[in-house]
Amino acid sequence: MIKKHFKKITEHFSLVKISAILVGVVCGLRVYCSLNNKGAANLNFSQDEFFFKPTVAQIAHESRVSKPMSHFFDEANTGNSNEERKVMFLSPINPATSSASPKKFKWVNTISIGPSLSLNQNSVSSSVNTSPAREKISEIREKVKEFGEELASNDLVPTQEDVRGWEDLGNRYLEYLELKLKPQLEQHNLAGFQFVNYGNLAERAKDMLANNTLCGLKVVKTNGESKLISISQFNKIFTILGENQLELEHHTISTLQDVRLMAQGVQQKQAVAMRLEPTLQNLLTTLRNQISNFEKTENWTIEPSFKNLMVYTAPSPFRLQGSMCCHLGEKSLSLGVGETTFTQFSESNPHFGLITGWNFGPKFSFGQETGLVSFSGYGIHAFCGLGFRI
C-alpha cells in the first residue's frame, strides 16, 4: 500500500519538487515562529502539554540558585518587585523533565550519533553490491598492465594458432554475456557480438598491448546488418545497454583471458598462466554473485546500521520534525519527516541527552565510482543515540 501511494505521488511530482515543498513548509514554519516573538501565548497548543506557570516560590528559588528571574521577564512587564509576574515557560520536549529555565519560542536543532534500524523498499540497482568486485577489478587491471608490459618487452607475438584459440574462447565468452544481457540487447535491436580478424598478427598484438584491449569486434543487429567497431567502444556499448556498473566490468575479464591466451604461445606461458588463474577465478566468482544479486526483484528489507550521524531540526513545540540520517558504514543518506524525543541526562545540563525517534522518507546512496548520489529506495527509519541539543 505504501509503495502504491508513493508511486502515485512520484508520478505527479518529482523527488526534487517534493523536497522543495517540504523545505518550503519547514521554512514557512520557521518564519512564522520568528514573527511570534511576543511569547508562547499566541500559539494554539495545549498548555498542559507544552507550558506551565512557575509559582512565586519557584521564582524565588530560581533567583537563589541561578540567574535573577528578571533576566527572563518581558521588558514591558515592569512594576512592583513584590508583584507576581506572569512568566510562560516553553519546553521543547517534556516540561516535567526539563531544566525549568524559562525560554522564548525558538528553533531546536539536535545532533546525534548512534545505531538505526530501517525497513526499506530497495530499488534493483541498490541490491547490487559492487564494492568487492571493483576492488578485485582494480587489482586485476594492474596485473593486466604488468603482463602486457612483460610481453611487450620481450617482443612476443602470438601465433596463428593462438589467435584462433583466442577468438574461439572470446566468442564463447560473448555468448555467455548475450545470454545474461539478452533482454537489453533486444531493446536496442542487437542480436549479439562477434570477434573479427583485421590486419596482420604483429599489428593485432601491437594494438592489443598498447591499448590493453581486444582488437576488433563486430556488432550484429537483428535485421542482419553488422558493423565493425573498435573494441575501445566496448564499454560505451555496455553503458548504453544497462545503467549499472555490472556491464562495465565484462571488458576487464575479456582482457584477462586474452592476455592469458597470448601467453600460451610464448616462453613464459606457465608462469603467467599460474599467476593469472587464481585471480581470474576469484573475479569470475564475484561476477556470478553480482549477477545473482542483480536478478533479485524489489523487496522490503530490514537493515540495521551502527555507524550513523543523525541531524534533526524543528520548531520547539512541534512533534513533526525534519531529519537527516547519514549511514556512514553503508555510504547512504536517509531524509525524512517524523518524530524525535530528547531526554536530557541531568537538569543541570539541558544540552546532552538520549535521542530516540523515527522518520519516513527516501534513501540515497553515494560514493559510487561515478561519485554521484543515486536514489536507492525509501522506507521507515528508527534510530536512537547520544545527542546534543543546540
From Swiss-Prot:
Work out whether the entry's keyword set contains Chloroplast.
yes
* Superkingdom per UniProt: Eukaryota
Provide a GO CC annotation, any one. chloroplast
Enumerate the UniProt keywords alphabetically.
Answer: Chloroplast, Plastid
Q: Where in the cell is it found?
A: Plastid, Chloroplast
Classify the main location: plastid
Q: What is this protein called?
A: Uncharacterized 43.6 kDa protein in ycf4-trnK intergenic region
The species this protein belongs to is Chlorella vulgaris
